[in-house]
Amino acid sequence: ITSLFLNPGSVIEYIIYFAVSFLISIFSGLFSYGETYIYLKTSCGQQPVLSDLFYGFKQTPDRIIRVAVVFSLISYLLNLPVFLLSLLPQETLLNGYGMLLFSLLTVVCAVIGMLLMLTYSQSYYLLLDFPDCSAREALRKSRDMMKGSKGRLFYIDLTFVPLMLLCVLTCGIGLLWLMPYMQATKANFYLDLVKQN
C-alpha cells in the first residue's frame, strides 16, 4: 500500500480505471435492460425485434441508470476491501494470517454481494412492467418480491453451472445457446413471481 501512495501516478491510474469501468457498467445497464425486455417479450409469447435491445435508451433512461448505479455500487463497494487487501506486499499476504484474512474477506464480500444482487434482481423487470414506477420503487418492490424466493433463484443459477462448465470445453461457443436459455429462464422466474404475489 505504501508504494501505491508513494507513487501518485499509480493512485490516479487506479482512480481513472475504476471511474471508467464504473461508467461502462452503468452504460451497459441500458443494454441489459433492453436484453431483459427481449426475453420478457419472448416469455410472454411476443415477437422481439432487434431494436428492442435499445429499448432502455428510449424509455426514461434515467430510471434505468439509477438502478444500474445501484448494481454497480454493490459490485464495486464489495470488491473494494478485497482490492485494497490485495495491494498489501506479497510477504504479508502469503503468511498464514494474511492469506486467511484475504480468503475470509473474499468469501464474505462474495456472499453479501450475491445476496444483494438476488434481492434486487427483479428491478429491470419491474421497470418494464410498471412504466410509472421510479427506480427506488422498483428496487423496493424487487426486495419485497424476493423475500422467500432468493433460494429458488440461487438454485436456478446453480443448475446452470454444469452447463457453463460444458461451455468451457467448447471454448465458449456453447454460451451462444446457454445465455439465451438462462435469460429466458430468469424471465419466466419473474413471471412466476408475479403470479405468486
Say what each PLM segment does.
Residues 1-197:
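Hydrophobic alpha-helical membrane segments
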